[in-house]
């Protein structure tokens, strides 16, 4: 059965009316909480088959998409288009969190992915997918990204004391900024304001974004000449992943969490993932697995030659003050 929980009430396939959460049947349940949404999903079963687990994964994906769409709708209807984001930048409502990325062999931190968050004074935490899509639709992704750069530069002295020399700073770049006239100058300015010779900036670009731009190869060559590295983000979720590997010079493949989440299930994921890893090695590209949440996933990925791991098994994204005190709680690398 399925139950959707909102505070103390639940809508369940086991009843035609709203029931109290305490009245739900007591049995084995898988629970998924949609982040930043006051909604909990429970999937009930006495035993879980591989087909049921795949169904649960698919159902959770649908719920996640629906929640993101709902947040985007609320954001676009309740807020004055454009004005709120610019006002939020001016009032300091955006902040940065850092998620560690570790070397798969030694389990030592080698860098971070930098992620932006928005705490609205009345709506609370707004999901990143919602406000980023909103900013792209309103042609505000460039000022939003420049504000992200400012926040990173502000944090850089502390990051320099925490991260080793050569540490990777993974930054997501939207297509609206990637092909803006100011992009090259923006990147040069950002690089010049970072502590010299300490960080290696990795620009994370989804394959869906590259599909629309024939000039991508020339731009990527320029970025490499300027000292930046490039990662294909969410690899395997777009339309022409293998074509990009053939035509563009990349440094990293970030394996989408959808592949990682199905490790251990009886699906075709393992052979597909094996093929991706083999291809990356032949192309001299490093691999980063996103969404690593369990020791079993980490073990499988390490045994199959993934270079870097990122996910809740290592750490959730953290604000700067929490990140500077963070100590990894991971097993010895030999385990």
Which residue stretches match the model-derived regions?
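Short acidic-capped amphipathic helix/loop micro-motif used as an active-site/signal-coupling element
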Residues: 120-123, 149-153, 234, 311
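Catalytic-site-adjacent helices and loops of nucleotide signaling machinery
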Residues: 78, 99, 124-128, 137, ...
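Extracellular/periplasmic juxtamembrane segments that couple receptor/chemosensory ectodomains to their
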Residues: 11, 15-54
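Active-site core of bacterial EAL-family cyclic-dinucleotide phosphodiesterase domains
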Residues: 80-133, 315-318
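EAL-family c-di-GMP phosphodiesterase catalytic domain
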Residues: 41-54, 175-179, 202-212, 228-229, ...
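Cytoplasm-proximal transmembrane signaling helix
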Residues: 50-80
